[in-house]
Amino acid sequence: MFIKGVILSSYGVNGYARVKSISNNFCDFINLKDNKVLLKKNNGFTIEVKVVDVNIKSNSLYLKFEGINTPESVKSLIGFELWVDDSLASSLKEGEYYLGKLIGYAIVNDNRRLGEVVSFFEYLNSVFLEVKVGIKFFFIPFLSIYIGDIDAREKTIELKVLDLLR
């Protein structure tokens, strides 16, 4: 499963939800029509819903879910993350990664395990990996100046700059 977006607000009177795309690629959302998705809240609450319509207007994305027909119903879903099956995830180009899939990867340098990716977050136009080293946590910018090879088979991420873990 992959996170594809977050519900931001209701839109109109018919129960549409305005959604922020995690990938900023709206085209892939068209494939969600007539498919079930999971809406997850960070408190662990999960709802399975069917997407019945996808609408893109003025650089904004709107989804309509089966059985959710009023703005009030959508308001209770604000902040929920939209999770989709792997088969509905956006396609990736060479060198692109689903950040959620990097959770659990080992951070290595010279084949020495230093820590583990436990989370990630986006701030402005930057992505940071949260890495646990022993009992400490560090944030590593997800940039090629700091991050080297990512090995999906070995589930490792090379750290080029060790000073980021001090």
Swiss-Prot record:
Molecular function terms from GO: ribosome binding
The entry's keywords: Chaperone, Cytoplasm, Ribosome biogenesis, rRNA processing
Domain PRC barrel: start-end pairs: 94-165
Main location: cytoplasm
Pfam families reported for this sequence: PRC, RimM
A biological process term (GO) from this entry: ribosomal small subunit biogenesis
SUPFAM superfamilies reported in the protein's UniProt record: PRC-barrel domain, Translation proteins
Recorded GO CC terms: cytoplasm; ribosome
Source domain of life: Bacteria
Localisation per UniProt entry: Cytoplasm
Task performed by this protein: An accessory protein needed during the final step in the assembly of 30S ribosomal subunit, possibly for assembly of the head region. Essential for efficient processing of 16S rRNA. May be needed both before and after RbfA during the maturation of 16S rRNA. It has affinity for free ribosomal 30S subunits but not for 70S ribosomes.
UniProt remark on domains: The PRC barrel domain binds ribosomal protein uS19.
Quaternary state and interactors: Binds ribosomal protein uS19.
UniProt xrefs under NCBIfam families: 16S_RimM, PRK14594.1
Recorded family membership: Belongs to the RimM family.
UniProt protein name: Ribosome maturation factor RimM
Organism: Borrelia garinii subsp. bavariensis (strain ATCC BAA-2496 / DSM 23469 / PBi)
